Amino acid sequence: MTLITRVLNGNLPLRLSTLKAARQLQCGYSSHAKYAEHKPIERIRNIGISAHIDSGKTTLTERILFYTGRIAEMHEVRGKDNVGATMDSMELERQRGITIQSAATYTVWKDVNINIIDTPGHVDFTVEVERALRVLDGAVLVLCAVGGVQSQTLTVNRQMKRYNVPCLAFINKLDRMGSNPYRVLSQMRSKLNHNAAFIQLPIGVENNCKGIVDLVQERAIYFEGEHGINLRLDEIPQDMRVESQERRQELIEHLSNADETLGELFLEEKPFTEADIKAALRRTCIKRTFTPVLVGTALKNKGVQPLLDAVVDYLPNPGEVENLAYIEQEGQEKQQIVLNPARDGKDPFMGLAFKLEAGRFGQLTYLRCYQGALRKGDNIYNARNHKKVRIARLVRLHSNQMEDVNEVFAGDIFALFGVDCASGDTFTTNPKNNMSMESIFVPEPVVSMAIKPNNTKDRDNFSKAIARFTKEDPTFHFKFDNDIKETLVSGMGELHLEIYAQRMEREYGCPVTLGKPKVAFRETLVGPCEFDYLHKKQSGGSGQYARIIGVMEPLPPSQNTLLEFVDETVGTNVPKQFVPGVEKGYREMCERGMLSGHKLSGIRFRLQDGGHHIVDSSELAFMLAAHGAVKEVFQNGAWQILEPIMLVEVTAPEEFQGAVMGHLSKRHGIITGTEGTEGWFTVYAEVPLNDMFGYASELRSSTQGKGEFTMEYSRYSPCLPDVQEQIVRQYQESQGLGQPEKKKKKN
């Protein structure tokens, strides 16, 4: 009888403390030595756990930390014991049972260091997922066995594709009523376009969930003892042998299509060994040509240890992923440099700041080291502003707890204190190499709300909170609107802004009032419009003189959130030193349109010719000429308003399908697809964000509280003519003006 099995028969508190000691004893390390040790690059994995909201990511991470001996006992997400999950360290997260910030931790499994980032599933916190994926080498995509592929799963999948992150899929919640992992697999193939196949099968689902079948090693695995800590290996049950053979054959066929080596064995009809299949799984997973699908239920402690084995066996180490830096020099194209992932510290240090957080000891900056080594006392430079920083303290994170380390190497994720920087900044030890890493993609905010502190005495704390949150989160914007004399905050959704309002009260003692949500409309041109503007001012002494000629035209619909400036001038009519002034003036005018007061976007400004005066011309004069040219185009061009369109997914019982479809149509929604299963239906639609406010309460009342929906930003699209007229009228009234006689889009 092993030490662990003997302990399982004792009393619970003793059992749990001894269990942890026993697990550390098995690994042959004391707790601190085990985690502080530096490993060779083959023994490191940087992984993220991503999924749709409520798929069980945080519960899965909690189980991983428990089985690897990182925590002594497990807690649930909405903790009945008032403790909450380890990774949900923010009080608000424990209350709501959702993950808001990406918590970072590291642990050890089979002598491999695993750095884990637990990411939010709610679409309003999508920038947290972007940041996490940017610095990871692999990911676990968690899917619900009942819900399957949902809207945020599609978003996470797109983000993984953007950053080329290899992934494993884990179908969780097999114990839930209505779970169907086979349907989820077919959705992965049809909706996510993954070449995916099971490498495990469930032995029973719902209340009959007993264990799993490993198709690679052809054996059954049962999870026994306290918290499923003992693995019992057995033969595949008699009633599952035919299905196991069929699914193993399917796995080999999918792998053979993606892997040349295995494909040759398959065509020559040679026998496969377990090692052949494992090697092919690793090669194809790293290349993103195949996605291994695992199954389990984290809440019921089944399938987690084999998932950890798969992370070690199939996901890449930092040396197997190519990371690039760019050398930027004026007047030259960006030059790509492949970074050296070796953990010897011979190359200069390169690191990327992917997250900022205001902790108890000042600003905490999370970094990933991509090349070289960093030690306490070293100096590093910010590639963006060339500021020098001395490293006083290096820490590794376990949720909100810190462990000091003396040095970090390529592949490590760590944090620094007191570094003044922005998310996405590159740090290096050599300030002269002009190298920087690609910055993190940040989506534009789509919702604004007026915000004000309830008490005037809290203004100082309000300012501190705003300053901290805007620095931490690049999707959270803040500005004071002079026209309406209100402070506006903008973000990715109502929940996003509500959570910041609650954090202000909780963390800064500053209760605030949020106004009604406002949509971030845009204004754009319908067709090209030429301009020829002369700015001339003579008031004694040197005057101002600038003439610019060109055309403003719409960009293609796929680029309608961008602004472009093109200098097409030839000769010296517009001296080159004044061209930046024209661009600056154009971009300043694009901050506020004249139709509705919203930003201009989807426009290209082509500067073709102009004129200057040898004495009176200056950059300021050309900037003011650009202001005048944009005003001229506003008067002469045809304009339209763009609005954000959201991808909406609604799930409800079948008897409410008619009501749900009717409500979406009433809100100008376009139904793009429907599907149904076992008494429930899901409808997919594209709906203008402006029409989605108040939908949550309408859905609850029309489905007796059983319906739920998610939405995410899709694109900007022209709004309907009557909506445009209403927006323009409201803007004119707010400015105290009558409706202008203005050319509108002819429909």
UniProtKB/Swiss-Prot annotation:
It comes from the Eukaryota. The keyword GTP-binding applies. SMART domains: EFG_C, EFG_IV. Pathway: Protein biosynthesis; polypeptide chain elongation. GO terms for biological process: mitochondrial translational elongation. One of its GO terms (cellular component) is nucleus. Its main location: mitochondrion. It is found in: Mitochondrion. GO terms for molecular function: GTP binding; GTPase activity; translation elongation factor activity. Residues 42-319 form the tr-type G domain. Keywords: Elongation factor, GTP-binding, Mitochondrion, Nucleotide-binding, Protein biosynthesis, Transit peptide. Mitochondrial GTPase that catalyzes the GTP-dependent ribosomal translocation step during translation elongation. During this step, the ribosome changes from the pre-translocational (PRE) to the post-translocational (POST) state as the newly formed A-site-bound peptidyl-tRNA and P-site-bound deacylated tRNA move to the P and E sites, respectively. Catalyzes the coordinated movement of the two tRNA molecules, the mRNA and conformational changes in the ribosome. Belongs to the TRAFAC class translation factor GTPase superfamily. Classic translation factor GTPase family. EF-G/EF-2 subfamily. This is Elongation factor G, mitochondrial. It comes from Drosophila mojavensis. The lineage of its organism: Eukaryota, Metazoa, Ecdysozoa, Arthropoda, Hexapoda.
